[in-house]
Amino acid sequence: MSAKRSIGDPEILKKRIPQNQKYQHVKTRLDTGNSMTKYMERIEEIKKNYRYKKDELFKRIKVSTFAQLVLQVASVSEERESGEMTADELQRLEDNSSVISDTEFLTDRPNGKGSPVSESKSPVQFIDSERGEEFIQTSRSTLQSVISGVGELDLGNQADKEKQSLPSSSALDKPYEDCPFLLLDVRDRDSYDQCHIVGARNYPTAMLSRTMNPFTSEILEYRNAHGKIIILYDEDERIASQAATTMCERGFENLFMLSGGLKVISQKFPQGLTTGSFPSTCLAPPTQTKSALKRTPRDPIVPAENKWRFSSQDLEIIENHVENMLMSTSTPSRLRLDSRNSKVPSSASSARSLSSTSSHSKPWK
């Protein structure tokens, strides 16, 4: 007897769908949730942009996490600076009704000149010593200020004049006070001058080969400090991973490496985080088509600015990019939540119907 043959080709499921290279970059707009295609795209992105290795001594920080950290540090520093101004004004209002003694005024000074060990001067001696020593101006209404004829109005006017004389860009030239992270660019000086993250300090890997003083004072200040971290980055993790491994072997426990480096930043945060022009190795190659007869000219190379803080425009751009990333990642979960919420009323209505039928079936007493 002959065996029964199945209808159709048994290899039909293994047949590959022909793909056209012309439409490879076109992606579907329909979000169907997690799929094998998205998983494979994620794996390809990791292989292309990241260099994960087994038994890494250092820890990693994502670009999106670093952007959120930048936004938090900027907001806290802004609140702190504005809070200091309001605290000075409140202190001035409180001190209008009380006059402190000279001993309290001298012992409140942070430097060593007015320590409690030193002798307290009388108001007359303080006035005489003003001409020979540096006079420290405060917003408090003290006895010697009243005697010398210096009022709070004069101090306020002088402070306003000093603020007006300072340029508006001076705030961007100073790093954030008490910043919780130290950002180090481990590339050479030329690459750093071309493009770097705002607020990053240049620390070439050649510094690690020194036998004497391989670390700067900033690195030693942040080394294993409580509540502070050190972040290294480069273009594509080739140099930063080696530098991070060496520093971890030398006792750094709060060291992180920025995953992906400038290559991932150019894709996810093309503006806002960096200053200058991205290197050509970080930019994606343009797609060439048959219809394109002329090549599009690239943007001219702009050198990096000497910025230590993010401007308000930069922070707004970074916040928009972060929101877009969070929206794209939360869309599948939001769809699942919507589907769950849509199922809840049906189950609740069925429970109500069962309870109503059971109540009607019971005899009334």
Curated annotation (Swiss-Prot):
Location within or outside the cell: Cytoplasm, Cytoskeleton, Microtubule organizing center, Centrosome; Cell projection, Cilium; Cytoplasm, Cytoskeleton, Cilium basal body
The organism's place on the tree of life at top rank: Eukaryota
Protein name per Swiss-Prot or TrEMBL: Centrosomal protein of 41 kDa B
Biased composition range(s): Low complexity: 342-365
Biased segments, Basic and acidic residues type: 1-14
Similarity comment text for this entry: Belongs to the CEP41 family.
Keywords: Cell projection, Ciliopathy, Cilium, Cilium biogenesis/degradation, Cytoplasm, Cytoskeleton, Protein transport, Transport
Pfam families listed in its UniProt record: Rhodanese (PF00581)
Family matches, as SMART domains: RHOD
Gene source species: Xenopus laevis
UniProt record, GO biological process: cilium assembly; protein polyglutamylation; protein transport
Function field: Required during ciliogenesis for tubulin glutamylation in cilium. Probably acts by participating in the transport of tubulin polyglutamylases between the basal body and the cilium.
CDD domains: RHOD
PANTHER family tied to this protein: CENTROSOMAL PROTEIN OF 41 KDA
